[in-house]
């Protein structure tokens, strides 16, 4: 690796360790020529699939565009940036796991909706209203009904337990 101080190619790795939960390698290096020390970070470069837009054109995956769309949906909602970054990471991992070189842009939109459904239901409805181009209030109602039917319901064990005992005795 080229020394950033003197430009010589002759450097030596002094220390290496994993950082960012194993996603990066941090290396301390020393230049053999000028003796300066510097740090480098290595990250695996993974090729993201290209996105096929509805008009048939192809576009490179743009993580910033994905992030901005999610941030717009969660605006003024109690969702942390860490949660957004985790959602983005999950979407990217799912994209890569498909093994495809190209995916319809619709795939990304659906993946965002799936993540927003986990993060914040209001953000989900906001995103869905733009993504699916809601025309009237009934489409909002349908999205909310879908959310309610897919959300995990907590059993009311205290109320249902005595009733089931009464039914068993009858």
Curated annotation (Swiss-Prot):
UniProt keyword annotations, A-Z: ATP-binding, DNA-binding, Metal-binding, Nucleotide-binding, Repressor, Transcription, Transcription regulation, Zinc, Zinc-finger
GO MF annotations, alphabetized: ATP binding; DNA binding; zinc ion binding
Keyword Manganese attached: no
InterPro entries the record matches: ATP-cone_dom, NrdR-like_N, RNR_NrdR-like
Keyword Acetylation: no
Cofactor: Zn(2+)
Biased composition (Basic and acidic residues): 160-170
Residue intervals of every unnamed zinc finger in the record: 3-34
Protein origin, superkingdom: Bacteria
Note describing how the cofactor binds: Binds 1 zinc ion.
Signal peptide: none
Pfam families xrefs: ATP-cone (PF03477), Zn_ribbon_NrdR (PF22811)
Ranges for domain ATP-cone: 49-139
Function: Negatively regulates transcription of bacterial ribonucleotide reductase nrd genes and operons by binding to NrdR-boxes.
PANTHER family noted in UniProt: TRANSCRIPTIONAL REPRESSOR NRDR
Similarity annotation: Belongs to the NrdR family.
Protein name: Transcriptional repressor NrdR
């Amino acid at each position: 690796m080229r020394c950033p101080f003197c430009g010589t190619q002759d450097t030596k790795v002094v220390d290496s360790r994993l950082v960012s939960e194993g996603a990066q390698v941090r290396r301390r290096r020393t230049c053999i020529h000028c003796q300066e020390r510097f740090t480098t970070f290595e990250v695996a470069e993974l090729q993201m699939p290209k996105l096929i837009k509805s008009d048939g054109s192809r576009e490179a995956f743009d993580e910033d565009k994905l992030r901005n769309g999610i941030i717009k949906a969660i605006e003024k909602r109690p969702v942390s940036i860490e949660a957004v970054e985790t959602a983005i990471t999950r979407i990217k991992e799912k994209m890569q796991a498909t093994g495809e070189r190209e995916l319809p842009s619709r795939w990304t939109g659906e993946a965002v909706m799936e993540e927003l459904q986990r993060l914040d239901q209001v953000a989900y409805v906001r995103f869905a209203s733009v993504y699916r181009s809601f025309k009237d209030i009934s489409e909002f109602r349908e999205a909310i009904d879908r959310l309610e039917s897919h959300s995990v319901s907590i059993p009311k064990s205290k109320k249902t337990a005595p009733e089931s005992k009464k039914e068993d005795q009858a």
